[in-house]
Regions:
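A membrane-periplasm/extracellular boundary helix in multi-pass inner-membrane enzymes
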Residues: 2, 196, 202-205, 267-273, ...
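Alpha-helical transmembrane segments of multi-pass inner-membrane proteins
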Residues: 2-4, 17-33, 52, 134-143, ...
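N-terminal signal-anchor transmembrane segment
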Residues: 19-113, 139-143, 444
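Transmembrane alpha-helices of multi-pass inner-membrane enzymes
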Residues: 32, 244-247, 285-290, 413-416, ...
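Interfacial loop-to-transmembrane-helix boundary motif in multi-pass membrane proteins
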Residues: 66-69, 119-136, 158, 169-199
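Aromatic-anchored transmembrane helix interface
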Residues: 95-106, 128-138, 149-172, 191
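Long extracytoplasmic/lumenal interhelical loops at the membrane interface
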Residues: 208, 338-354, 358-402, 421-425
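Hydrophobic transmembrane alpha-helices and their immediate junctions
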Residues: 401-445
């Protein structure tokens, strides 16, 4: 295979030296001009410009590392910490986050990487669809600003939706064997860090953060003794569980080190997901696991069920020893599903969706723009009306903000990823991760009915990554018939 101009060894090879020199000259000139302007206007922004330049270099020299840091920062690191170290940000006014730098730098790299690689019909359609969606998001940002919506809200919602562009960054990386293996290794470490962070928050009784993405929120509805619900990482726990489970059971991993890491990550994320006490995330996890089981061979399906049962029993037993009241709370929370007719949260969501639906009907094609809000209250709970930018139904939220056509484009791309077949030459680990990514997408599609996945920075880049893992074929040649994950240790 001719690999000139493609991504190899985690680095972008542009081919001709003249092209590289010209590109670097243009980038250097642009950076110098920007630095001069910033020095004249606001000297403290020079540091931000220097960091931006360093991140851009990282994206071109080590794109796998750049992508891994983007996922780590958004899925694990709380937003309050990201915003504290942002450029021009504050408590109520988010600035330029480090995750923004990694995303933008990665998209610049992806533009060159995708342009220099052969695209089959499926990849071309998926890349084109994502580019069109991101362009619509940019237009909706301008739409919201033109209508006078709050810049902070417009910027935050735009940041989240642009995070789906991680798909474009990951697509070239997961298509080649070396970068794919390095990415798998990095994702295993991130999954472990995510689950460990969840348990640290729960056992350490971290207070509920202002951004709502860290700590333990006090109280558990419809239970008699629940002390709180884990919030930090809640959207990503099901994803980690499903993908780790698929890799462990279908990936034929020989290295005991990596198997041990994945087992630990699986157990920690199961425990963390359990103590969120969010029924939607439990159903999300079950839907994804069932998807993985559905496509497994007959004999292997029994093995998968036994492994899943063993992991669940071990995790539940450990939690019962550490926090005995957890199982009682989880049982009561699960039983409460049958009493949905008297559940005030169901009424809340139905009424809320009615207000959002009215806004969708008012602007079905163009959307109301990012930053749009609704004004309503809950008289049955004596909650006065107030302005809200949030909707629990993620599909309604997306159609409300960017319009029905753009929402249908993104959802269609997600659904199409569920039916992508593995190439005949695909190695077991890559096939397992692909199946896990498809299962995670299936679970997210279920959870989005009651939780707005598309409006959360903690999961949007992960969704883009899952799309790439599910859709991208392998372009690199296999070096061995049954790859071992021990080769990933070089990452």
């Amino acid at each position: 295979m001719n690999t000139t101009g493609t991504e190899l060894n985690g680095e972008l090879v542009l081919g001709r030296p003249f092209v590289r020199i010209s590109l670097l000259t243009l980038l250097a000139g642009a950076v110098a001009a920007l630095a001069g302007a910033l020095a004249a206007a606001q000297p403290k922004l020079i540091l931000g410009a220097a960091v931006s330049a360093a991140v851009l270099v990282l994206a071109f020299r080590a794109p796998v590392t750049n992508l891994a840091l983007l996922i780590l920062l958004t899925a694990v690191v709380p937003f309050e910490i990201l915003n504290r170290f942002s450029v021009g940000g504050g408590v109520d006014s988010p600035g330029l986050l480090f995750s923004d730098l990694f995303l933008l730098a990665g998209l610049v790299w992806a533009a060159f990487a995708l342009a220099s690689q052969p695209l089959d019909r499926r990849r071309y359609r998926s890349v084109f669809a994502m580019v069109v969606f991101l362009m619509i998001v940019v237009l909706e940002v301008l739409h919201g600003l033109r209508l006078g919506y709050g810049r902070s809200i417009v910027g935050q919602e735009g940041r989240v939706l642009l995070g789906l562009g991680t798909f474009l960054i990951a697509m070239p990386l997961v298509s080649h064997s070396r970068s794919r293996e390095r990415l798998f290794a990095a994702l295993a470490l991130i999954a472990f860090a995510l689950g460990a962070w969840g348990m640290v928050q729960w056992l350490g009784h971290f207070s509920f953060g202002l951004a709502g993405d860290v700590g333990v929120r006090s109280g558990v509805r419809l239970t008699s003794g629940g002390s709180g619900q884990l919030q930090g990482g809640a959207f990503a726990f099901p994803v980690a569980i499903i993908v780790c489970f698929a890799a462990l059971t279908l990936g034929e991993i020989r290295s005991w080190v990596w198997r041990g890491l994945l087992v630990a990550a699986l157990a920690l994320n199961i425990a963390s997901c359990l103590v969120t006490f969010e029924r939607s995330f439990w159903l999300d996890t079950l839907a994804g696991l069932l998807f993985v089981l559905l496509f497994a061979a007959g004999r292997r399906r029994v093995k998968l069920l036994l492994i899943l049962l063993g992991a669940g029993v071990f995790t539940v037993a450990a939690l019962a020893i550490i926090t005995p009241s957890t199982l009682t709370t989880a049982q009561q929370r699960l039983i409460s599903i049958s009493s949905y007719s008297s559940d005030t949260s169901v009424r809340y969501r139905v009424v809320e969706s009615g207000f959002v639906y009215d806004r969708i009907r008012a602007h079905p094609l163009t959307g109301s723009g990012l930053g749009a809000s609704i004004f309503w209250g809950q008289p049955w709970a004596q909650v006065p009306p107030k302005t809200r930018h949030y909707s629990h139904d993620g599909y309604f939220w997306l159609a409300w903000k960017v319009g029905v056509p753009a929402a249908a484009l993104l959802i269609g791309l997600l659904v199409s990823a569920l039916f992508t077949r593995s190439p005949a030459t695909e190695d077991p680990l890559s096939r397992a991760v692909r199946r896990g990514a498809q299962g995670a997408i299936a679970g997210l599609l279920v959870a989005t009915i009651t939780f707005p996945s598309f409006s959360q920075l903690s999961i949007a880049p992960v969704i883009g990554l899952l799309l790439a893992l599910a859709l991208a074929p392998q372009l690199g040649r296999r070096r061995r018939s049954r790859p071992s994950v021990s080769a990933l240790a070089a990452a």
